[in-house]
């Protein structure tokens, strides 16, 4: 039996710091997939946008990450090997 679904493994740490306001999945996750053609597209999916200057924090659920991937790639199966929630901290470098 063959499946048309592609399997992507994701791993996120509990705390992640970013230095730019537009946050993509590639900024906050480690990813692995046997089909290397879809990884670049998944890494560029924007998941957050910080609008204020200074330090800001946001808690991001892995379910929101899976939802964002499925919007663009509905046939991709996601397996989370990391934290269920990720705290993303934006540190404005200006």
For each predicted feature, which ranges?
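N-terminal, intrinsically disordered, low-complexity segments
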Residues: 1-73
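Extended, hydrophilic extramembrane loops/domains of integral membrane proteins
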Residues: 59-93
């Amino acid at each position: 039996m063959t499946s048309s679904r592609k399997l992507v493994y994701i791993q996120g740490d509990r705390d992640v710091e970013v230095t730019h306001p537009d946050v993509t999945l590639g900024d906050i996750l480690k990813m692995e997939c046997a089909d290397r053609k879809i990884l670049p597209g998944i890494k560029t999916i924007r998941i957050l946008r910080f609008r204020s200057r200074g330090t800001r924090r946001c808690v991001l659920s892995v379910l929101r990450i899976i939802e964002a991937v499925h919007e663009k790639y509905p046939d991709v199966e996601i397996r989370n090997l990391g934290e269920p929630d990720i705290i993303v901290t934006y540190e404005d470098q200006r």
